[in-house]
UniProtKB/Swiss-Prot annotation:
The lineage of its organism: Eukaryota, Viridiplantae, Streptophyta, Embryophyta, Tracheophyta. Pfam families: F-box, FBA_1. It comes from the Eukaryota. Residues 1-43 form the F-box domain. It comes from Arabidopsis thaliana (Mouse-ear cress). This is F-box protein At2g34280.
Length: 391
């Protein structure tokens, strides 16, 4: 290596996996400095993405009331095509979290009503905690009286500034039952409750964004003028987070993480009304494309958005007669996870994620890629291994 120009050495290092690069840091100060450089880390991640094969992470998750106390393995990476998983040790082994379904640059975001939120790189084990939002603090009181919220945290990246942002978007009625006269609230909570109660009269939603620089949450004004569907996971694609809207027709709502503005994406072929839209429509990121999966028996069709021409194209059609014979009958749409080997679709059983299936559109075949042989409360998600952290 000493005989090679250093730019050639960097070119070689960029193509190594993260585990090898972590070992290479001990070779020399120059190598260590290179591997710690953000520009190098971004190039390494780009090469990883070009492999077209993300890794699969299994995260033990909390139920809605955080009742499950026993946790065996908080995080595991899966070996597809087998029943093998590799445990990832974490400092929070005794605490259950919920997880954002969209990873970003190899980072995963975990959140909890009763403990600090966490951004973690499961490959390097780096993690950073950040505080509860206003919504989470107030939602904690809702849990105490038996009410359960359905809003879910989004996580993505401002592509212009390169900053990462956790985002809450929730309908104004979500915390409508709060009373700022309650003695359990502190002054800050009472002020926020008063603001939310006043806002309920003239706004559809509230939006909160966390700034890792100031280490604080702030409200985005104006928030979305459209209410969003319950129980859906925000999806990150290309600098924006996305939700499905509520109403007689279902639209795709986009939040630009740089401009921090909302807009409705072009008209979609699934605009007709769904009686149980949160069950029949699932939004996802497949190969860095915004996709919507629509269940209409006997098929589940997956549409992909062409961001340049603002048009939708059907890219997959899943035969529900076949999958129901494998998974059993279920009222929910199957959950797409990622694309492997350029065009094979990986998806999972919708409620528990305990069985992973691959669909090959060329041969129209289906086969199990991972099966659990005991009950699980963990959810799978796809990510690309990286060296990225949040400074």
């Amino acid at each position: 290596m000493d005989l090679l120009p250093y730019d050639v050495v960097e070119h070689i290092l960029e193509r190594l996996d993260v585990k090898s690069l972590l070992n290479c840091k001990s070779v020399s100060k120059q190598w260590r400095s290179t591997i710690r450089c953000r520009a190098f880390q971004e190039r390494q991640l780009m090469h990883r993405r070009q492999s077209c094969n993300p890794d699969v992470l299994l995260v033990s998750v909390a139920d809605e009331f955080y009742l499950l106390k026993r946790v065996h393995q908080v995080m595991r990476t899966l070996v597809l095509g087998s029943s093998v998983s590799v445990r990832i040790l974490t400092p929070w082994e005794d605490t259950l979290y919920k997880v954002c379904q969209s990873s970003c640059d190899g980072l995963i975001c975990l959140y909890n009503t009763y403990a600090s939120n966490i951004v973690v790189n499961p490959t390097t084990r780096w993690h950073r905690e950040f505080p509860l939002s206003t919504f989470q603090r107030l939602d904690r009181y809702e849990h105490q009286v038996g009410s359960v919220s359905w809003a879910k945290l989004g996580f993505g990246k401002d592509k212009i500034n390169g900053t990462y942002k956790p985002v809450w978007l929730y309908n104004s009625a979500e915390l409508g039952g709060l009373n700022d006269d309650d003695e359990d609230y502190d002054d800050e909570d009472k002020n926020n409750i008063s603001m939310i109660c006043q806002g309920n009269n003239n706004t559809s939603t509230f939006c909160e964004v966390f700034d890792f620089t100031t280490k604080a949450w702030r409200f985005v004004v104006p928030a979305s003028p459209y209410r969003i569907l319950p129980y859906q996971d925000p999806v990150y694609v290309d600098g924006s987070l996305h939700w499905l809207t509520e109403g007689e027709t279902t639209n795709v709502l986009s939040f630009d993480l740089h401009a921090e503005t909302f807009q409705v994406v072009s008209k979609a072929p699934f605009l007709h009304h769904h009686d149980y839209s949160s069950r029949e429509l699932i939004m996802c990121n497949l190969d860095d494309r915004l996709c919507v999966s629509e269940k209409m028996w006997p098929n589940q069709v997956i549409w992909s958005l062409d961001s340049d021409h603002k048009t939708w194209k059907e890219i997959y059609s899943i035969d529900l007669n076949i999958t129901s014979s494998l998974f059993g009958s279920n009222g929910f749409a199957l959950r797409p996870l990622g694309v492997f080997d350029k065009d094979k679709l990986l998806f999972c059983e919708p409620e528990y994620g305990d069985q992973l299936l691959t669909h090959d559109p060329k041969t129209k075949s289906y086969e199990f890629d991972y099966r659990f042989f005991s009950p699980t409360t963990a959810l799978p998600l796809c990510y690309f291994q990286s060296l990225i952290s949040i400074l």
